[in-house]
From Swiss-Prot:
Homodimer. It comes from Ehrlichia chaffeensis (strain ATCC CRL-10679 / Arkansas). It catalyses: N-succinyl-(2S,6S)-2,6-diaminopimelate + H2O = (2S,6S)-2,6-diaminopimelate + succinate. This is Succinyl-diaminopimelate desuccinylase. Its cofactor is Zn(2+); Co(2+).
Amino acid sequence: MAIDPVILSQELISFPSITPTDNGAIDFLSNTLSQYGFTCNVLTFGNDEVQVCNLYAQLGNGHPNLCFAGHTDVVPTGDLEKWKFDPFSGHIEDNILYGRGAVDMKSAICAFIAAVSRIDFNQVNGAISLMISGDEEGNHFKYGTPAILKWLTDNNKKIDYCLVGEPTSKSSVGDTIKIGRRGSINFKIVCNGVQGHVAYPHLAQNPINDMINILHKINNTVLDEGNEYFQPSNCEITSVDVGNTANNVIPGTVTAHLNIRYNNIHTSESLFNIINNICAETTQKYQIFTSLSGDPFINYPDKYSDMLSAAIKKTTGETAVISTSGGTSDARFIKDFCPVIELGLKNDTAHKINENTSVDDINKLANIYEEFIKQFFNISQ
């Protein structure tokens, strides 16, 4: 019996799985998939501080193994008073489904499950699997998808191609496919001076002057012009702080934070060299700290991305745009294990108050996924 993706979405949204808390969402999916013949492995990883509940479910044992990747955790709701409806009620009003996770990305998970439920698995020469993380949105993501991938390797399980259900669409479902993502690196720059009284500047050294010059140079540096698949890299100054509340004190230290979203023209090392050289040209009294969120990657268009584009065209009439724009996703981990592509709902209300998606869009996404599965396994229509 085929699953209704909208009803399943309502049920999954009802679990308040604010990252990294699960609150039963993974068990619900495991129980649902078990009824359709999936072998389900509920996988919990973590430390003394947090335990993240994940799921790997597989139907069949052959190859190729087509895997759908997603996450059940959601961002916090924000001010509940500003929501039209309870964010975990899965309420539908005027054909619109409201709820935290409706877009990012519980409904996409349900659309894929519904698509699989419509398939005659006797015609599948291979396997279909789902890899569902319990922490993609939060700070404990290493216990989500990366830990599942390690478990797969340790247990000699292999996925051959992965479809990630992140909300990639812009104006209409299926208008944008992600074949890669930009990298993201954070910089913390500290300039040191000598604290003192503003009336005696000759006895102090104001580090703000050096920082202003550094940030001005960074802001006027063109990192690159982009290429065929990536937009130009860009740097954003996200904060400047001296921790000084007194008007008559020259601060001794100033700190700035930057984030660079970068394409495959650069590496984290090349960007560090650019920032470091700018600092060194200005002052010797500085420190740089970095944290890498993910390197850029691309899976160049292939027969499977062509299949997904064809599935979109057949079911919606839409000609999909191939893109690498947007933020990071768990695809940055999966790309080291197999080719990966991303397609999901429209992203215009993701993480917002009154996050919502239309019922029609959920059904449309399920239809696209179903057609893609059929083309992937060459299933007769």
